[in-house]
From Swiss-Prot:
Disulfide bonds: none annotated. SUPFAM superfamilies: Radical SAM enzymes. It comes from Xanthomonas axonopodis pv. citri (strain 306). [4Fe-4S] cluster binds at residues 18, 22, 25. Pathway: Cofactor biosynthesis; pyrroloquinoline quinone biosynthesis. This is PqqA peptide cyclase.
């Protein structure tokens, strides 16, 4: 048995159910049904095991975690175990009664997604009427209770020019931080890549908007910025390094090195119903496979950044090259790097196709029906 340093944080994807239908969602295409979700006892056990390992943070996510009636109980359990608790939410489910319960349970932070500052644009992306006004009310309720608030704003070709407005919204809503993140193309985001890909000019404009706001605002608002990989020369480290800092639990109880890992065919993902979290983290095939540097191809082995970017994203390597064990094709050392850039430029210059909205197949309406 090998012993790896414990992860810093655990992401609990409590459910794939969600009132929104965002076409950039990173959830898998095959969404877990309600009947497949792990029960309260299973999630409580997971939190206990995480605390016993030395994990410090528990992030409650989904789907929409506020659709789980046991969420306050799970937050209270995390608090009792000494885990920092963070809620990642759409803000359109649960309302103030649930928020009161979560505050009483010891919730320490809220991350609220915002699709756009333009109400019509927000509804179009979310597939949900009056989404922005609902989120505004939720943000006000969060701040009225004294909870720290982070705004998560996802960028794409349809809203990239509104970064200044998103930053202004974060200030208006009294957020302490905003994450301005370009779409990452996994799950539904990959399926909708051609509909979402911004141009290089749009990317440069978003960079300028963020840098300008940072200079003007100073410490009034923390601004994180995530670029789209397809225009990069160097890859980002996968979750701080595959199997090194982060562990993701799917609604079914599968233990994943990252939220998109299930796209890697042929890889075995262990389940908490069958094996302990510590054993999976230390010895599970999915975690050992790409942990460290021994797995890396020769071009990565000789790179001075091999322990900085850790070879980039395994899921992206698979999606773009067909091989999860090769270097991330967004790296300039990749033989298909130029093809990746060319694909992004071609897609962004072409008319955007209709969105494929994030819905279970049996519920998937036509795009034109989403807002009727």
């Amino acid at each position: 048995m090998s012993i790896a340093p414990p992860p810093l944080s655990v992401l609990l994807e409590l459910t794939h159910r969600c009132p929104l239908a965002c076409p950039y969602c990173s959830n898998p295409i095959a969404l877990a049904a309600l009947r497949e979700e792990m029960d309260t006892a299973g999630w409580r056990s997971l939190l206990q095991q995480a605390a016993d390992m030395g994990v410090l943070q528990a992030h409650f996510s989904g789907g929409e975690p506020m659709l789980r009636k046991d969420l306050p109980e799970l937050v209270a359990h995390a608090r009792a175990l000494g885990l920092y608790s963070n809620l990642i939410t759409s803000g359109v489910a649960g309302g103030e009664p649930m928020l009161d319960q979560l505050q009483a349970a010891g919730l320490e932070h809220v991350q609220l997604s915002v699709q756009d500052v333009d109400p019509a644009g927000a509804d179009r992306i979310a597939g949900y009427r009056n989404s922005l006004s609902r989120k505004r009310e939720f943000a006000a309720a969060v701040r009225a209770r004294g909870l720290p608030l982070t705004i998560n704003a996802v960028l794409h070709r349809h809203n990239a020019e509104r970064v200044p407005g998103m930053i202004a919204l974060a200030l208006e809503w009294q957020a302490e931080r905003i994450e301005v993140a370009h779409t990452q193309y996994y799950g539904w985001g990959l399926r909708n890549r051609a509909a979402l890909m911004p141009s290089r000019e749009q990317l440069l404009a978003t960079i300028d908007a963020v840098e300008t706001a940072r200079r003007q605002l100073g410490d009034r608002l923390a601004i994180d910025f995530v670029t789209p990989d397809y225009y990069a020369r160097q890859p980002k480290p996968c979750m701080g390094g595959w199997g090194q800092r982060f562990v993701n639990i799917s609604p079914r109880g599968d233990v994943l090195p990252c939220h998109a890992a299930e796209t890697i065919e042929g890889m075995r993902f262990d389940n908490l119903r069958e094996r302990s979290l510590a054993d999976i983290w230390n010895n599970g095939e999915a975690f050992v496979r790409f942990r460290g540097t021994a797995w890396m191809p020769e071009v990565c082995q000789g790179c001075p950044k091999r322990e900085i970017d850790w070879g980039g994203c395994r899921c992206q390597a698979l999606a773009l090259s067909g091989d999860a064990a090769t270097l991330d094709p967004v790296c300039e050392r990749s033989p298909i790097h130029a093809q990746v850039r060319a694909a992004a430029e071609q897609e962004s210059a072409s008319p955007a196709p209709a969105f494929v909205y994030r819905r279970p197949e049996r519920l998937a309406p036509a795009a034109a029906d989403m807002l009727e």
